[in-house]
Amino acid sequence: MGKMLKISILVIVLAFIIVAGVYVHTNYQPTETALAYLNGTRDVNVTNVTTGLFLDGPGNDTALIFYPGAKVEYTAYLPMFTQIASEGVDCYLVDMPINFAFLGVDKADSIINESNYSHYFMCGHSLGGVMAGEYVNHSSNVDGLILICSYLEKPVNVPVLSVYGSEDTVLNMNNYNKSKSMIVNNFTEYIVAGGNHAHWGDYGEQSKDSPSHITAEDQQKQGADEIIRFIKQWP
């Protein structure tokens, strides 16, 4: 191997290491509070599955499939979705390739194909919501869509719940308002007063977000209650 070729390979390897290091450094990791939920609760059993985590609560009729936000570890969302599972809606938290949902848009396919629920709802936070909407656009197996501080890029023909915080300065409101015209079925909007972008998960503060005026626990409780209310109104 020539000297110049060796140098070129070394430069490429070093560049990859630097890029990987920067990515890992800017990735949003779950807090200890979130990770404690890996042990489950009295009402919810948490298990590892091929697509991520399965939160098995007392219900057996309805499942919620969740796509996380960009660069956020899916385990960071355990607290809120454990609340939802405890109310009778089993939840799948999907582990996306390098934490970008656009690299795993169709991951819901295997969940739906390998389970036996009567009803499926898609849900996503931020970029995960955009990709959940993308999935719903070409799937006939979904009963509804929940967008958490997110918006649509393609039309959907199922009921939609949109939830976001009043202090969210990450959500692109121009895109959000434009996307409302893509909802051709029932649309429900719920704004959490004082809530921000990051506190739907437990991963700390997020770049370009504004401080929340309420606790993460309060924000997640309001969101979980509204999601349960939305799902249970559709027989």
Where are these regions (language model features)?
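N-terminal Sec-pathway targeting helices
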Residues: 1-17
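Catalytic histidine neighborhood in serine/cysteine hydrolases
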Residues: 183-208
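A conserved short beta-strand
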Residues: 141-151, 159
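Conserved alpha/beta-hydrolase
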Residues: 81-101
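Gly/Ala-rich beta-loop-alpha elbow adjacent to hydrolase catalytic centers
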Residues: 123-132
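Short alpha-helix in the alpha/beta-hydrolase fold that links the catalytic acid
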Residues: 80, 171-182
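Short beta-strand element of the alpha/beta-hydrolase
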Residues: 61-69
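Short beta-strand/loop motif that positions the catalytic acidic residue
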Residues: 162-168
